[in-house]
Amino acid sequence: MDHRTPTPDNPWLALRNLTPARIALGRTGTSLPTGAQLDFQFAHAQARDAVHLAFDHAGLASQLSDRGRDSLVLHSAASDRHQYLQRPDLGRRLNEDSIATLRQHTQANPGGVDLAIVVADGLSALAVHRHTLPFLNRFEEQAAADGWTSAPVVLVQQGRVAVADEVGELLGARMTVMLIGERPGLSSPDSLGLYFTYAPKVGLTDAYRNCISNIRLEGLSYGMAAHRLLYLMREACRRQLSGVNLKDEAEVHSLESEGSASQKGNFLLGKG
């Protein structure tokens, strides 16, 4: 006689091919199968590692230089990772040395710019390392015809979203785009977030920002994120505002695979 606890068939199992989300995990008796439990622990470890991974700003600056882009490396008022996690307010402001660096740059390059791109580690430096350059490649390809002037790419260590407001104000930028590592999830330790602000200045709330989230190969493609950002930027320049009063109404004809532009259609329905 077989005394093993039977594992019931799981009708949701086929849906696991459509999403990295933790669905259709199955069960053994009243508990999760061993494999699902181990996968959960591994995903949790990946999320913790993403939060504490050091920002390789020197490596990113070197890659930007190889593409002909200048960069400025700055630091928030949070002195280290521990203080960054304990004091979110310090991650929203620059330290004194960084403020002085931006002021010197502005004095040497008066007149302001249309766009300041700010990159910060946030809660996942892994996301920044993986997705910043591929996204910027797609964005700059699509934005070339607009003729916007831009400042050097600003790399902020221990930075939070609002630090881009201070950067933009000091540079005299009409718009800022913040690329930042999002809080890791159990299936997405490397999601890149994007925050767009028109007329940045210190003290703005989230109501004045537009967010485009989950930029990564398994989420929103680089091309689609760039398309949505450009729509917001063009509308912001026309209407002179951003945030809750500016809705993302960019036309999206179909989902595009980053690997092949010919793969179109809704992933839930199969290939179009």
Swiss-Prot record:
GO molecular function: cobalamin binding; ethanolamine ammonia-lyase activity
EC numbers for this chain: 4.3.1.7
Binding site for adenosylcob(III)alamin: 161, 182, 211
InterPro entries: EutC (IPR009246), EutC_C (IPR042251), EutC_N (IPR042255)
Cofactor binding annotation: Binds between the large and small subunits.
Any one GO biological process: amino acid metabolic process
Subcellular location: Bacterial microcompartment
Broadest EC class assigned to this enzyme: lyase
Catalytic activity: ethanolamine = acetaldehyde + NH4(+)
Keywords: Bacterial microcompartment, Cobalamin, Cobalt, Lyase
Assembly mode: The basic unit is a heterodimer which dimerizes to form tetramers. The heterotetramers trimerize; 6 large subunits form a core ring with 6 small subunits projecting outwards.
Function: Catalyzes the deamination of various vicinal amino-alcohols to oxo compounds. Allows this organism to utilize ethanolamine as the sole source of nitrogen and carbon in the presence of external vitamin B12.
Protein name (record): Ethanolamine ammonia-lyase small subunit
Lineage of origin: Bacteria, Pseudomonadati, Pseudomonadota, Gammaproteobacteria, Pseudomonadales
Recorded name of the encoding gene: eutC
